[in-house]
Amino acid sequence: MFRIGKETQYAVVEMGMSHAGEIERLSKCARPDVGIITCIGVSHIGNLGSQENICKAKLEICAGLPEGAPLVLNGDDPFLRKAVLPDHVRPVWFSLGDENADVCALSIQQDEKGMSFVLEDHEEGTFLVKIPAMGRHNVANALAAYCAATRLGLNARRVIAGLADFEQTGMRQKVVHVRGVDVIEDCYNANPDSMKAALAMFREYPCKRRFALLGDMLELGDISRAAHEEVGRQAVENKVDYLVT
């Protein structure tokens, strides 16, 4: 934050947390113009106790948002849908498939190069979007980024062009081709939601046989055993041929 100078037009700040109260403090320090909550998963549930508490902790981002600021929210998340939002923020809902949302993705398709979909925006219109990242979860991420940028006043077509040039960060969906084998390196971190998303993406990846090498998931508290077992079931449902843990 201290390295952001006057010449900086836009700064994207990730506000991580593992306990209640942390995001409120960060948001009051950053004073963002727009907030984004992508989903309510189970990361750090060992510290916070429940997804309801995780939702409350993430909504602390509102503490630093000014009056009328856009708050971009995942309309497919049941915890966010039930959440009571403060009056001073303006919710902007995105969804994979729900045309009642402010912004939605339809006709979603995946190939070895990434995802394509039709984006419908009640304010800006309809667009064909392509992103060089695989998995429906990355479509949701693209919608969140689009909502934030356009509600800050950026041109919708310019934002979509930017999404087409998106580059993954390290250890996220890096595909290496070795002697007829495609190795997908996607191991930056692991939680039940990211594991399920990766396995769902893997199912749609065009190949003959699928080998999944999965590591541990931490900070899950009492649900750790059940969460690991559920990921095993997800591997079966998503047609993994060989599973190594």
Regions found by a protein language model. Give the residues of each.
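Active-site phosphate/ATP/adenylate-binding loop shared across adenylate-forming ligases
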Residues: M1-Q9
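Active-site beta-alpha connecting loops in nucleotide-dependent enzymes
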Residues: T169-M171, C187-T245
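Short, glycine/acidic-enriched loop or turn micro-motifs at the edges of active sites
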Residues: M17, V42, D77, Y188-A190, ...
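Short beta-strand segments
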Residues: E14, T38-C39, N74, L213-G215
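Short glycine/serine/threonine-rich phosphate/pyrophosphate-binding segments
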Residues: H19-I23, V139-A142, P192-K196
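Switch II (G3) loop of P-loop NTPases
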Residues: T8-I23, V183-N189
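Acidic, Mg2+-coordinating active-site environments of NTP-dependent enzymes
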Residues: D33-V183, C207-K208, R233-Y242
